[in-house]
UniProtKB/Swiss-Prot annotation:
Belongs to the tubulin family. It comes from Encephalitozoon intestinalis (Microsporidian parasite). Pfam families: Tubulin, Tubulin_C. Mg(2+) binds at E69. Dimer of alpha and beta chains. A typical microtubule is a hollow water-filled tube with an outer diameter of 25 nm and an inner diameter of 15 nM. Alpha-beta heterodimers associate head-to-tail to form protofilaments running lengthwise along the microtubule wall with the beta-tubulin subunit facing the microtubule plus end conferring a structural polarity. Microtubules usually have 13 protofilaments but different protofilament numbers can be found in some organisms and specialized cells. Keywords: Cytoplasm, Cytoskeleton, GTP-binding, Magnesium, Metal-binding, Microtubule, Nucleotide-binding. This is Tubulin beta chain. Tubulin is the major constituent of microtubules, a cylinder consisting of laterally associated linear protofilaments composed of alpha- and beta-tubulin heterodimers. Microtubules grow by the addition of GTP-tubulin dimers to the microtubule end, where a stabilizing cap forms. Below the cap, tubulin dimers are in GDP-bound state, owing to GTPase activity of alpha-tubulin. Its cofactor is Mg(2+). It is found in: Cytoplasm, Cytoskeleton. GTP binds at Q11, E69, S138, G142, T143, G144, N204, N226. GO terms for molecular function: GTP binding; GTPase activity; metal ion binding; structural constituent of cytoskeleton.
Amino acid sequence: MREIIHLQTGQCGNQVGCKFWETISGEHGIDQSGRYVGTSDNQLERVNVYYNEASSKKYVPRAVLIDLEPGTMDAVRQGPFGELFRPDNFVFGQSGAGNNWAKGHYTEGAELIDSVMDVVRKEAESSDCLQGFQITHSLGGGTGAGMGTLLLSKIREDFPDRMICTFSVVPSPKVSDTVVEPYNATLSIHQLVENADETFCIDNEALYDMCFRTLKLNNPGYGDLNHLVSLVMSGVTTCLRFPGQLNAYLRKLAVNMIPFPRLHFFVVGFAPLTAVGTQKFKTYSVSELTQQMFDSKNMMTACDPKKGRYLTVAAMFRGKISMKDVDEQMSMVQSKNSSLFVEWIPSNVKTAVCDIAPTGLEMSATFVGNTTSIQELFKRISDQFTVMFRRKAFLHWYTGEGMDEMEFSEAESNMNDLLSEYQQYQDATVEDAEEFLVN
């Protein structure tokens, strides 16, 4: 089987990761102790991608749980799915990173990284044919951002030909935990551009907006946000976990989605979004799902696709849906909004259909878009970074851990390059495209 090893790092990464395992265990009929209690052969056909079958007939996630302080790990162990994970795969320090990227990347994280890589290698050895890794982390803190990107570069070194995809939670000024988030995020994006193959960008601001606007929650907590993220993660990985046709492997998804290697940051969305408890009062058609899915209100990244252009799009539909309906609806969206799709990538929208609907829904659609409008997100972080960096505010926390100002300048200019690359391809025409191909 083509296995995927899942790594969750830092508090946010671990909380999002646990919600992901909760969601997909439900879909594969695996209970809290790892026993199979499902009813369909489809649930088990590709279960080995994410789970290892132990001799006791117990399914164990191929997951490594990492943090620089023990608190998060204790919470996972005491949570509903705490017994599911292999005890040896919890790797944690005692000191914490104090929201400092340099501590996660260069000092505290560097001390723990060898123990983490030992566990990763052990997991890789128990795989038949490893296809790659997925990492859940946030970009605003110390451990998920700093140590998460250190882990990324170590995996890239040790497994140069495997795919690495990240689910990265991007900080937002409206929902800010710490004042140095723009530094941590810019330094992380600098690493993601170079070392990740695919990055699904998830944005707290967009998640909060969804909770208020669509789900009508008055006081959403992290549990609500993580639930939304797990819906998207479950949708994005559907093709990897169940028998299907399109994008059945991480590499195939990348080949369809990434026209230029640096532009691998995706906007994700999910439909239907319904307030808790109202699902059972409504049924959806393929056309409604398609409409919702392309609506910026359903995007989990705070940028408006209408302000940019789609380079590529992948859509995963789930449930008892006819392929013909899906193709018709997707063609209609393209013809109605042709100006939003670049014309120099001819068949840039791909769709997949999986019979197995997510728990509690009759049908759903997950959206993955490679759109130039994601530069809004990077611009937001870059502007905040610049304001602080010009005054060298808070820099002593980073230089005190041995970092050099030069590294900040490099990260800043890499971010600016990324912005101008997105802009260049947004403005490009068919004639320009011929030049890109020649170069």
